[in-house]
Amino acid sequence: MTVSRLRPYATTVFAEMSALATRIGAVNLGQGFPDEDGPPKMLQAAQDAIAGGVNQYPPGPGSAPLRRAIAAQRRRHFGVDYDPETEVLVTVGATEAIAAAVLGLVEPGSEVLLIEPFYDSYSPVVAMAGAHRVTVPLVPDGRGFALDADALRRAVTPRTRALIINSPHNPTGAVLSATELAAIAEIAVAANLVVITDEVYEHLVFDHARHLPLAGFDGMAERTITISSAAKMFNCTGWKIGWACGPAELIAGVRAAKQYLSYVGGAPFQPAVALALDTEDAWVAALRNSLRARRDRLAAGLTEIGFAVHDSYGTYFLCADPRPLGYDDSTEFCAALPEKVGVAAIPMSAFCDPAAGQASQQADVWNHLVRFTFCKRDDTLDEAIRRLSVLAERPAT
């Protein structure tokens, strides 16, 4: 029997949609995992590590070479310095890092601010910590989405302890601007908040967008836990190698929780990820270019079918509105889509939290949108577009 605070989160929509897609042979544009492998040298390094006996517990904070590689990568790309001995912690994916940060730094009864819509693990880990969620929605901005800084400022109360920020943003594909990040920094400093930043798509930004780590803004280095992962950077979502970077005092809190979640993980994958961080910048750049082209390919196909497609400047995802085709409820639309046309997608309402006050209203606002992933091979995207074209031939109304 599941405890009451976790009953709303018993099964994720991603697991449900992926299982349905597998069962009926649908093209899975719902869950964000690529169908191509990462850098060959990284894959070989993992095989070599296994063959070489790197199969027992690694050090609790992560292997020293990986922590050094993470710190060097942050410095090289973003100009942010971390001591690999005390300010870098290797985790079992970014999801564990997020959970450990909340569990290790947020007291029961305090409030955590979430920007809605949000990745589905945020809300349950806040519940696990015994804290309260307070949501602040993104707002439409032309063909994209933007932060309402005034709404964020109003949401802060004396009980607010932490703020979780995700940019590049899953599910919308928005990338927070320097102006938006500066506003977040000003609010966080004024209210003395801990900020947990989920930056797993930091290298997957397109067009004019630029990823700026919040830790680099004035007053933020001492209060920010920056979380990232090898999964999206190197097409290895199943390896579950993530990390958290931040001031030693905060990282100690994250580690205190993390050590009782998984203790350690992925011993033979850690040297492989270290190698990739040190040597595969060109591979990541090629991945970014490929994803930009695939985003354009999927967006063009959806537009031709009749969807209204929103701009995506980062991540694996874009949002589309099926109302021009006669579908007003994306939850119902996505539930029927696999069997109707053989494609799986995720309703935007899955990223909203109806248990968190005003979020129940926001679920209605977002429920006309659908999230599709474009991190698939061209032939996979083309087949999905071919199947979805049935909707243009037989619209709902």
Swiss-Prot record:
Binds 1 pyridoxal phosphate per subunit. Pathway: Amino-acid biosynthesis; L-lysine biosynthesis via DAP pathway; LL-2,6-diaminopimelate from (S)-tetrahydrodipicolinate (succinylase route): step 2/3. The modification N6-(pyridoxal phosphate)lysine is found at K232. Belongs to the class-III pyridoxal-phosphate-dependent aminotransferase family. Pyridoxal 5'-phosphate binds at G109, S110, D218, G219, M220, A221, E222. Gene3D superfamilies: Aspartate Aminotransferase, domain 1, Type I PLP-dependent aspartate aminotransferase-like (Major domain). It comes from the Bacteria. It comes from Mycobacterium tuberculosis (strain ATCC 25618 / H37Rv). Transmembrane segments: none annotated. GO terms for molecular function: kynurenine-oxoglutarate transaminase activity; pyridoxal phosphate binding; succinyldiaminopimelate transaminase activity. This is Probable N-succinyldiaminopimelate aminotransferase DapC. Keywords: Amino-acid biosynthesis, Aminotransferase, Cytoplasm, Lysine biosynthesis, Pyridoxal phosphate, Transferase. The lineage of its organism: Bacteria, Bacillati, Actinomycetota, Actinomycetes, Mycobacteriales. The keyword Amino-acid biosynthesis applies. The keyword Transferase applies.
